[in-house]
Design a protein with these regions (language model features):
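Conserved ATP-binding/catalytic core of the eukaryotic-like protein kinase fold
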Residues: 14-190
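Negatively charged linear elements and acidic catalytic determinants
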Residues: 1-11
Length: 190
């Protein structure tokens, strides 16, 4: 399924034709795919292990096989560019991006291992005050995106994951898949 890594325009590329039920432990450049952790209409998100220059767990998002129309690719590229423009503690960070040798773009981002906002609040029986305090950083993250000219357009509990950092709950906004740029274009195709 996979060919050895190559470079195209300075970015790693290789052949990757994963079926949704493909076995894990395949390589995509310096990333070892471990487990599919999410799937949307056009893309799949895999937990992966970055092998170099540092070892760490990451999330790798790639367009589904057969869904690589111009419109879908443009939307995908807009999402990764939107993420690249933002630097906020409550927005999942992008680390890397590339294209397989079959033209399927992917990007690598911070792995947020958490649960949806409402699930966290319900499981921990948070009071209204505690829920509001947990939601303030979400509002700050959305404001940061707006200051960068990015509108998320899909804020919902499943796109705000709560993870623990040193025992403290930290909400993270994820999935800028339908984000829109205001007053600018994210890519030449959007």
């Amino acid at each position: 399924l996979l060919a050895g890594p190559a470079l195209e325009g300075g970015r790693p590329t290789l052949k990757l034709d994963l079926a949704p039920e493909a076995a894990p432990a395949q390589m995509l450049g310096r990333y070892k795919l471990l487990e599919k952790i999410g799937e949307g209409g056009f893309g799949e998100v895999w937990m992966a292990e970055q092998r170099e220059p540092v070892k760490r767990r990451v999330a790798l998002k790639i367009i589904k096989l057969g869904m690589d129309s111009r419109q879908v690719v443009a939307r995908f590229e807009a999402e990764r560019q939107a993420l690249a423009m933002m630097d906020h503690a409550n927005i999942a960070r992008i680390f890397d991006a590339g294209t397989t040798d079959t033209g399927r773009p992917y990007f690598v981002m911070e792995l947020v291992q958490g649960v949806p906002l409402t699930q966290y609040c319900d499981q921990h029986r948070l009071t209204l005050q505690e829920r509001l305090e947990l939601f303030v950083p979400v509002c700050q993250a959305v404001q940061h995106a707006h200051q960068k000219g990015i509108i998320h357009r899909d804020i919902k509990p499943s796109n705000v994951l709560v993870t623990l950092l040193d025992g403290v709950p930290v909400p993270k906004v994820i999935d800028f898949g339908v984000a829109k740029a205001v007053g600018q274009r994210l890519t030449d195709n959007t």
